[in-house]
Regions:
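Conserved motor-coupling elements within RecA-like helicase/translocase cores
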Residues: 23-63, 71-77
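SF2 helicase catalytic motif II
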Residues: 66-117
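Conserved Walker A/P-loop ATP-binding site and its immediately adjacent core
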Residues: 2-25, 44
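Flexible beta-alpha connector loops of hexameric P-loop NTPases
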Residues: 33-42, 87-99, 159-168
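Conserved interdomain linker/interface between the two RecA-like ATPase lobes of SF2 helicase motors
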Residues: 103-190
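Loop/turn-to-beta-strand initiation segments
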Residues: 5-8, 32, 56-62, 76-79, ...
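Switch/connector loops and helix/strand junctions flanking conserved nucleotide-binding motifs
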Residues: 18-20, 43-46, 72-73, 88-91, ...
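Alpha-helical scaffold elements adjacent to nucleotide-binding pockets in ATP/GTP-utilizing enzyme cores
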Residues: 20-24, 28, 48-51, 80, ...
Length: 191
């Protein structure tokens, strides 16, 4: 994307998470990396705003930021990365405007004819559903850090169980069976 002269927006759910990513990206991309978030002074935000909108500027081709970075005046956006896309911090409740940054990133990418990459070890249910419906592509990691075993994920349509008069709870029959088996083995459960 950068070789094509385009810009990259790297969204993080929390400002506190930017330090590690900034160091890694600046090591590789140097002064092409800029950071933008609401805790910057007005002067700092204006400076980044100007660099991002300037078609002749080679600095700040990669912008790392939280939700507010979506509103920068990108002049040639080629890729938006939404790291930890499942995180509730991407939802803006107060003050207005109310929005979901992940969904806004997808719309912004379409407006710029850019690509969107949603990253998460635990994707949001709607994202996982969109991959199952092949609306989104899915890249799976088959090995976890430290050799931890991958969980077995099964999607169950509760509406079908309700129609068959098999279940009227918020939990599917296979989930309840798995919980019972885990408890019988004295294992822990997290919902």
């Amino acid at each position: 994307v950068l070789e094509e002269g385009k810009q990259v927006l790297y969204l993080l759910p929390e400002i506190a998470l930017t330090t590690q990513i900034i160091h890694r990206l600046r090591t590789y991309f140097g002064n092409k990396v800029g950071v933008y978030h609401s805790r910057f002074s007005e002067f700092e935000r204006v400076e980044i705003w100007q660099h991002v909108s300037d078609k002749t500027s080679d600095s700040y081709r990669v912008i790392i930021g939280a939700r507010s970075a979506l509103f920068l005046p990108f002049n040639n956006l080629g890729l938006i990365i939404v790291d930890e896309e499942h995180d509730m911090s991407y939802k803006q409740f107060e003050p207005s405007p109310h929005y979901q940054a992940r969904d806004s990133a997808i719309v912004l990418a379409k407006l710029h004819e850019a690509k969107t990459l949603l990253g998460s070890a635990t994707p949001a249910i709607e994202t996982y559903n969109n991959t199952a419906r092949e609306k989104y592509g899915l890249v799976s990691l088959y090995q976890r850090y430290g050799g931890v075993e991958l969980p077995n994920i099964k999607i169950v349509d509760l509406r079908k169980e309700n129609r068959k008069k098999q279940n009227y709870t918020l939990y599917s029959k296979p989930l309840l069976e798995s919980i019972t088996q885990a408890l019988a083995k004295k294992e822990q459960i997290i919902l």
